[in-house]
Structures are given as C-alpha cells and as structure tokens.
Amino acid sequence: MENTENVRSGRNQREYSKERQQEGGYKEVSKAAVRKEGDVKQDMGPSVSMTVVGEKVEFTQHFHF
C-alpha cells in the first residue's frame, strides 16, 4: 500500500515541476543559480553553471584567472 502511494506522489511531483517550467517557474531557479555561481567564483575560481533546456540539463564550466 505504501509503495503505490510513494510512486503516485513522485509522479505528481514530476508533473508539477513540468507545469512550473512551462509557467516560467524556472526563472526563479536561474536567479538563484546565478547567485550561487557568483559565490563559487569568489570561493574557488572555476565555477559550474547549470542550464535547463527542456528535459535536458547542460553543464558549462567557466574558469576565471
């Protein structure tokens, strides 16, 4: 019984996040990602930024010397 509930709630979460992306909810995430990327630059130098393109996730590395 518990297993089916967990699976169902997981599916609902996935559908919810897809809806959020279509509504432009990802803009909030990208703002936070930019802020985090800035923090990483100050701490370590090289930083990794994440771009979500549809279903795919792309990682780009930036090196600052």
From Swiss-Prot:
Biased composition (Basic and acidic residues): 12-42
Organism, scientific name: Tobacco necrosis virus (strain D) (TNV-D)
The protein's name in its UniProt record: Probable movement protein p8
Stretches for region Disordered: 1-47
Superkingdom, taxonomy of origin: Viruses
InterPro entries: DUF5428 (IPR035284)
Pfam families linked: DUF5428
Regions of compositional bias (Polar residues) in chain numbering: 1-10
